[in-house]
Amino acid sequence: MKIFRHTITNTKSTKLMCSVLLLSLTYLTLTVTTASAQLRAGVAKVNITNPDIKGNITDSLFVKALVLKSQNTSAIIITVDAVAIGGIGSLKDNYLSEVRSRVKEELGIDPQNVLINASHLHGAGYNVCQDVEARTIQAVRLASQNMVPVNVGAGSGYEDRITENHILKLKNGKGWAIRHANPLPPDEEIESIGPIDPEIGILRLDKKNGETLAIVYNFTGHPYQSISEETGGYPGFASKLIEKNMSEGTIALFIQGFCGDVIPILYKDVHSVRDQEPLGIMLGMSAMDAIRNIKPVRTGDLKIITEVIKLPRRTDFAERIASMEKEQEELLRSLRSTSLNFKTFLPLYIQYNIFKEYPSYYSHRYLRERDLGRNDLKKLDEENRRHIAKYLQNIYAMEKLSRLQYNIGLAKEREIENESAGESTIDVEIQALKVGDFVLVTFPAEVSVQVGLNIKNKSPFKNTFVAGYTNGYIHYAPSIDQFGSGAYQDHNCLLGSEWQKIYEDKISEILKKL
C-alpha cells in the first residue's frame, strides 16, 4: 500500500510539474512571438542648409532618417529637402550608392533596404550643403543609436485645397502645362483639367510611454519656392507644425508622392506674393486631424522588397521633334504684318474692350455723325478692331512659338540622353515597404498622379501610398494618356509609353508578396 500511495503521490506531482512546465512553455512561446513582432525605431534629423545660398533663408532644410528594426529585418527611410536623388540639383549621381555603402559598412544593413526620398524642393532644394552625404550618414548614425520599442499605427488624411493639376486639357486634344517658362493658352481653348491626389498617407510611431517618436506622412504636390524667400516649401512648414503639436522631440518625415503633374494652387498669380507657408499650415493641420485619430498598436511587421526592372526607352523623339518643328513653321507663316506696335496696341486694346459700343469718343459724337449721314467713327473703329485682332493673333502665335521652342529643346536633350545610353531599356529600382498597416511603393521619377491613383485603387492594402523621387531620378514618367499630348511632361521623358503598364503590373505582383 505504501508503494501504491507513493505512486499516486508521484503521479500527482508529475501532473502538477507538467502543468507548470506547459504554462512556462506557453509563456515562453508567447514571449518569443511577441518579441518577433516587436518593432524598434530610432529617428534623427540634421541641418543641410547651404549657408552660401543666395536669397533670404527663412528656415532650414533637413535630412531626416528613420531606422526600423524587427527581429529579422532592418530598413531605413531617409527624406531629403532636395530637388532629386541625383540627376538634377546638387545631390550627386553617386549620393545614393555612397550613403548605402556607408550604411552597410557601419550598421550592416542591406543597401536594398535603404529608401531615400527627395521632397523635390525647388529653389533652395537645388543647392543644399556640399557635405550632404556625410550629414545624411550622421542622421542615420544618430537614429540608430537611439532605438526604442514602438507601437505602430497607420491611416490617412485629406487635403484638396492646396494643389491643382499641372496640365490643362485643350479642346484640340492636346495638353498645356502651367509653367513660368511659358504663358497659358487663351481661356477659350481650355476644356478641362486633370486629377490630383488629396490623400495624406500617415505612419505613426509611438514610444511605449505613449509619446510620439516619429510621423511619416506622404502627400502629392510640387513644393515650388516662394517668390522672395528660400524655405523648405510647404513640406517644411507642415513638418514644423506637426512636430510642434506632437510630443517633444517628435520628428516628422515628409515623403513626396507622384506629383509629376500636380502643382500648388495660384502658381502663376501675379497679384500677390507667392507664399508656401499658408499651404504648409493647411496640410499640417489636415495631417494632424488624421494623426490624432490613429491609435498605434503594439505589434507591427516590417517587410521590404526591392527589385530592379527594365523599362523601354522612348524611340519616337525624331517623330515628335519633326511634328513640333512643322507646327513652328505653320505658326511662323501665320504671322501677319501689322500697323500697330505694343505702344499703340495696349491703349487701343483696353479702350475697345471697356467701351465696346462707343470706343473712340463720347456717344453724342456718334449720334451727331448719324444725323449728318456720316459714319467716320464707325469706320475708324472697324479699322482699329482689325489691327487689334491681327496684333492679338501675332501675340498668340508668338506665345505658342516660344513654348514649342522650349519643348523642342527638352525633347532633343532627352533624345541625346537615351541615344548615349546605348541600350533600348533603362534599369529602374522600385521598392515596396510595409510597416504594420502602412504600405509604400516607390519610383525614381516625376510620375503623373493618375499612376499613383491606379496603384492605390488596385492594392489589397487599405493604407497604400506612393513615393516618387525615390532612389534615383530619371526625369518625368507621364501616364499613357499624356504621351503625344504635347505637354511639358510628354517631352521631358526618357520612357516609352509601355512603362506604365509594366510598372503597375509589377507593383501588383510585389504587393501580393507583402
What are these regions (language model features)?
Residues 32-36:
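Signal peptide processing junction and immediate N-terminal pro/mature segment
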Residues 37-251, 255-281, 291, 298-514:
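Conserved beta-alpha junction segments in alpha/beta enzyme cores
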Residues 3-6, 29, 111, 209:
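Residue-level detector of alpha-helix boundary/anchor positions
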Residues 1-14:
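N-terminal secretory signal peptides that target proteins for export/translocation
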Residues 284:
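Charged, flexible cofactor/metal-binding loops and thiol motifs
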Residues 18-31:
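Bacterial N-terminal signal peptides
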Residues 7, 17-20, 86:
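Composition-driven detection of intrinsically disordered, low-complexity segments
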